[in-house]
A protein has these predicted regions:
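Active-/binding-site microenvironments in catalytic and ligand-binding cores
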Residues: 48-422
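A generic secondary-structure signal for well-formed alpha-helical elements
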Residues: 28-31, 35, 206, 346
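N-terminal twin-arginine translocation
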Residues: 14-19, 30-48
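Small disulfide-bonded, cysteine-rich extracellular recognition modules and tandem repeats
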Residues: 23, 44-46, 77
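N-terminal secretory signal peptides
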Residues: 1-19, 26, 42
Length: 422
């Protein structure tokens, strides 16, 4: 890309000069690297076809017929066995983890990337009732709190320190709220901010992954099948598909939206990431193949709408006009490789507000991946660090909350990667 194209796009929206120059320079560096031929970082990325082990099948957007979810013929029992609760996490074997670690070359600096959003009180979330909320409160013990602390919602346990050594301490609690649908105040959830959706999260009617039926495993405390106790931890190969970076480098500003209030670019609100985009992003990042047990992550720039906690940005983040992402054809194309997780920096992974959404289906990609394929979904992963350093292949690790019966984990994943020189 001619960096002037990016400068013109950013100046149109009055982005500050420092960001304009930095991003234009980065785009130019990526183009230079791409034109020179980016070498894969490991044996797993080989110089083969971008499709890797592509079956060559004909993948389409035809919705699965959920008129009779009890017809399990093509998706249950799972390829991993009739009683399986781990899904594609089964692909993350000891050998897979060892191969993933070989991505890191001896003697080269390794950077640790936090892929999680910073949570704050009032963090936005998909609207449900009862609401998904995050309202943290500090508790104090051992001294008199400052003026206004209690009035603002802080909690004083005692002003008296403990013991002869006058021990004082801080802890956190989480505020709860009443809902018209439930008589007991409810507090936070793992289904907020950066999260990894588990297989017990989404189904069709009574039916969930591997044919498990909701009435058979729903309990007051959580699910008795497909809960977080069957999920992690995992350490495996991660692959970044930088759709935003690729569009910037190619000068395709028509696929971009108005920048966030911090001046950072993002994909157009209802932009559908196609299979062709995926293959092009693999080539852009020097990724030769997607392998079983990989974690595949899409960067769209959507997380920049949370950077300043700006009301207008947050409204856009909630996606009243749509959100970029994949749809069924892309989900099915990726599922053939049996990745452990497919995720993005948006809160849904799948495209919203696009004409393909006009068929009346609600979050069909979630059903396709979680229920039919046992592939977990990552949401609101922060991918700017690896993208800025042109780290398209890395070691991915996450340990979701080890919470019995939970439907997701919102512990931030990490990536270990070796930055490329610009």
């Amino acid at each position: 890309m001619n960096p002037d194209v990016l400068r013109n796009y950013l100046s149109k929206y009055r982005t500050n000069r420092r960001d304009t120059l930095r991003m234009a320079g980065a785009a130019g560096a990526v183009v230079v690297a791409s034109s020179a031929g980016v070498q894969p970082a490991s044996a797993e990325t080989g110089n083969g076809s971008p499709a890797g082990t592509d079956s060559g099948g004909d993948f389409d957007d035809k919705p699965f017929d959920y008129a009779d979810p009890a017809n399990l013929a093509d998706w249950a029992p799972s390829r991993y066995g009739a009683g399986d609760q781990r899904g594609a996490f089964n692909e993350v074997t000891a050998a897979k983890t060892a191969a993933a670690l070989s991505v890191l070359k001896p003697g080269k600096p390794v950077r640790t990337y936090n892929l999680g959003e910073l949570m704050w009180n009032g963090f936005p979330a998909f609207k449900t009732d009862p609401r998904r909320i995050h309202e943290q409160r500090l508790t104090i013990a051992g001294y008199q709190p400052p003026p206004g602390f209690l009035e603002a919602g802080g909690v004083l346990m005692t002003t008296e320190p403990l013991g002869a050594n006058k021990l004082s301490y801080h802890e956190e609690r989480f505020a709860a709220e009443l809902s018209p649908l439930h008589p007991v105040p409810l507090a936070s959830t793992f289904q907020i901010a950066t999260q990894t959706d588990n297989l017990g999260h989404i189904g069709a009617g009574e039916y969930y992954y591997n044919g498990f039926r909701g009435p058979d495993f729903a309990a007051a405390h959580g699910v008795t099948k497909l809960g977080n106790e069957h999920m992690g931890p995992i350490a495996t190969r991660g692959v970044l598909l930088d759709i935003l970076g690729m569009k910037l480098a190619e000068g395709k500003t028509g696929d971009l939206a108005e920048p966030a209030s911090n001046g950072k670019p993002l994909l157009r609100e209802n932009y559908r990431i196609t299979v062709e985009d995926i293959k092009a992003a693999m080539k852009f990042g020097g990724i030769g193949r997607i392998s079983p047990g990989d974690v595949v992550l899409f960067r769209t720039g959507w997380n920049q709408l949370l950077a300043r906690r700006d009301a207008g940005d947050i409204l856009r983040w909630e996606a009243p006009n749509g959100m970029p992402g994949i749809y069924l054809r892309e989900a099915r194309w990726l599922a053939q490789f049996r990745p452990a997780v497919i995720g993005s920096d948006t809160w849904a992974l799948e495209v919203l507000g696009n004409p393909v959404n006009d068929n009346g289906s609600a979050f069909p990609v979630h059903q396709e991946l979680l229920m039919r394929n046992g592939i977990r979904i990552g949401e609101s992963y922060v991918l700017d660090g690896p993208a800025d350093d042109r780290v398209y292949e890395f070691v991915f690790a996450v340990t979701p909350q080890f919470s019995e019966g939970a439907t997701a984990g919102n512990t931030p994943p990490l990536a270990l990667g070796q930055p490329r020189r610009h």
